[in-house]
Amino acid sequence: MKPVWVIILGWILLVPRVGTAWRGPPEEASFYYGTFPPGFSWGVGSSAYQTEGAWDEDGKGPSIWDAFTHGRKEQVLGGDTADTACDSYYKVQEDIALLKELQVSHYRFSLSWPRLLPTGVRAEQVNKRGIKFYSDFIDALLKSNITPVVTLHHWDLPQMLQVAYGGWQNVSMTRYFSDYADLCFEVFGDRVKHWLTFSDPRTMVEKGYETGLHAPGLRLQGTGLYVAAHHIIKAHAQAWHSYNNTWRSKQHGLVGISLNCDWGEPVDIDNPDDIEAAERYLQFCLGWFANPIYAGDYPQVMKDHIGTKSAEQGLEMSRLPTFSLQEKSYLKGTSDFLGLGHFTTRYITQRKYPSHQGPSYQNDRDLVELVDPNWPEMGSPWLYSVPWGFRRLLNFAQTQYGDPPIYVTESGAPQKLHCTQFCDEWRIQYLKGYINEMLKAIKDGVDIKGYTSWSLLDKFEWEKGYADKYGFYYVEFNVRNKPRYPKASVQYYKEIITASGFPNPQEVESWRLKALETCSINNQMLATEPLLRHMHVASEIVVPTVCALSILTAALMLTLLLRRRG
């Protein structure tokens, strides 16, 4: 039997294949040729902290990620920061030109809360320069016939709120977030019609309050992430009600949330324990946030498992907070659409973790995640290309949450190591497979309105620094003006958008060949023009070196002159 890699709390173990799990789903093996419905929206995404730079300019306040990368350099690969990132704050027109080249119909980006409210509190200070920046950016997008899809909060909480209140551990964040959201609705809502309150809050709380790998870097295992999530869910609902009560009748927009989840497939489809474990995986991942928003409360399996574990650990109350009857009613139905992010798939099997091991999110789930070594590995060790899982997740979301309109808010793959810079054929295959499974899900009856590929640019990738490169456009971070260069996937994605699907085998294959031909030309061009590529780097190195040598020479001459006089 061949081995399977198992991921358990960051450790990698080796176990044999078991049962009947390692099947290739025959109904999903064939490629489907067809087109998407009229009006389907194609886009790309990014976030403020990862791309903007200008971390302390034009009145912006510090975020928790500024504090984290400046104060804990050992926790970010290479000690990198996003102080300048892609310099998108100063390259608006250049980045919009890239969006136009891709021919996308929408662009998903986030607003920086501390750029608009430096302390995080609306009553204390509103940064007019921040408002002007985003207002001008939105206008420029609309002028280019690109619809803005705006995320209010993508992990960069104002540092002042973290210091003063403990961030999302404090229920007061719900009020401050609602005030911030209301400001955004007021000043941008006449032009923005698609809002996302939060982006992937599960990862935000798990890595920020459980493992400490992300800002604010807290390790409150088995408690902190549930408290933070509880407050985030309330904050989302409060922002939705604010829009619904005050702005909807005037602006006619939509407010949702972006929730990321991988698909969980039972290792053995004939084993009830594995089936239950896979369901539990999805509920602890997607249901954790989606269930309160669509049904008013946490999934029953979360309440049961965390409650039982808490009791076994000698606690009088569950570590999972509870909603009051009034809060349940307030939460239910607070989303105009479901934003769904998806990257990969896991096989899931049952495993009972003893309660004496201590509280943790991983132990609460009582399961193990596995991957098939035959799955194509992308550029990051956690991400494998498993397109069929995407279709299954989309169908699950439709059934679980009452057939909501779904916008795919992020999906993509990073660059492989040791690859040709621009010839990202693995990303082309990823796009082809995942978008095709999304098309199949639409044929299944899932109401999918749009797709956002992640991401426009190579950018700062949190604890990975600049190592993981998800962009359609390569960014030369070592050059002062950070030029952008298209990868092969730009041409391929553009063809999918133009055709709105996959017309026939011959045409789809011609797209791939054309894209790879284009990237080869780009690689050759850059290889023959190294001086032009690195002129800025050379100026940054040579000029200071010449100045330093001049100073040293002058100092030496002065020393010799003084000695002669002495």
From Swiss-Prot:
GO terms for cellular component: brush border; endoplasmic reticulum; endoplasmic reticulum membrane. The chain crosses the membrane at residues 541-561. It is found in: Endoplasmic reticulum membrane. Its main location: endoplasmic reticulum. Keywords: Endoplasmic reticulum, Glycoprotein, Membrane, Sensory transduction, Signal, Transmembrane, Transmembrane helix, Vision. PROSITE patterns: GLYCOSYL_HYDROL_F1_2 (PS00653). Disruption phenotype: No visible phenotype. The lens of the eye appears normal in young animals. However, formation of the lens suture is abnormal with an X-shaped or double-Y shaped morphology instead of a tight Y-shaped pattern. Optics of the lens are distorted and cortical cataracts develop; the phenotype progressively worsens with age. Expression of CLIC5 in the lens epithelium is almost completely absent. Strongly expressed in the lens of the eye, where it localizes to the equatorial epithelium and outer layers of newly extending fiber cells (at protein level). May also be expressed in kidney and skin. However, another study suggests that expression is specific to eye and is minimal in other tissues. One of its GO terms (molecular function) is hydrolase activity, hydrolyzing O-glycosyl compounds. Glycans are attached at residues 170, 244. It comes from the Eukaryota. Residues 562-566 are cytoplasmic. Belongs to the glycosyl hydrolase 1 family. Klotho subfamily. This is Lactase-like protein. It comes from Mus musculus.
